[in-house]
């Protein structure tokens, strides 16, 4: 499915063997309680910082985004979310579409979820501001700091920052 090749190791031998071993036991369990899920939740509870003992599992990246948005807003009691321009977080749900800045996934689906703010990704190779490092003095980070500290941006205390690690 989708980008499953990236998460399954691009045909790495050890990953293939682990997948085959697991396929002999259980191949699919949508939201069903299973022993592997319980063991993973237990392990996560053991290694998480004090006070963070609960786990929420989703079936895909869209679930991960929706769960993250819900938890961030619920925990912080704040509604604003920052995402980066060029990020793609899915198009199946309104939360995913709203933090995605790619236009083709939003076409005809307005209004979006309120409180989403897109800022330029700090990427020196293709600077959104047309500047060059190091002469720019990391102007892109100053821009984001101004978004957070500036009195006129409406973004003083965001609930979360959503980052796509493979932005491209």
Predicted regions and their residues:
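Active-site beta-strand/loop segments that form the cofactor-binding cradle
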Residues: 1-5, 164-166
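A structural motif shared across PLP-dependent enzymes of the aminotransferase-like
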Residues: 3-20, 30-43
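Short amphipathic alpha-helical interaction patches enriched in hydrophobic/aromatic residues
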Residues: 23-27
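Short, flexible active-site-proximal loops enriched in glycine and acidic residues
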Residues: 28-35, 51-55
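PLP-dependent aspartate aminotransferase-fold enzymes
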Residues: 42-159
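Conserved PLP phosphate-binding loop immediately N-terminal to the Schiff-base lysine helix
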Residues: 125, 162-168
């Amino acid at each position: 499915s989708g980008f499953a090749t990236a998460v399954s190791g691009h045909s790495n031998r050890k990953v293939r063997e682990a997948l085959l071993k697991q396929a002999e036991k259980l191949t699919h369990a949508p939201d069903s309680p299973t022993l592997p899920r319980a063991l993973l939740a237990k392990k996560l509870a053991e290694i998480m910082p004090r006070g963070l003992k609960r786990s929420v599992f989703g079936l895909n990246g869209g679930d991960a985004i929706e769960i993250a948005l819900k938890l961030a807003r619920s925990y912080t009691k704040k509604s604003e979310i920052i995402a980066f321009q060029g990020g793609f977080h899915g198009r199946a749900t309104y939360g995913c579409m709203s933090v995605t800045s790619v236009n083709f996934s939003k076409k005809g689906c307005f209004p979006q979820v309120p409180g989403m703010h897109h800022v330029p990704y700090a990427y020196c190779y293709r600077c959104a501001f047309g500047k060059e490092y190091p002469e720019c003095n990391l102007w892109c980070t100053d821009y984001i700091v101004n978004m957070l500290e500036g009195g006129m941006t409406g973004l003083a205390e965001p609930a979360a920052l959503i980052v796509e690690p493979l932005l491209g």
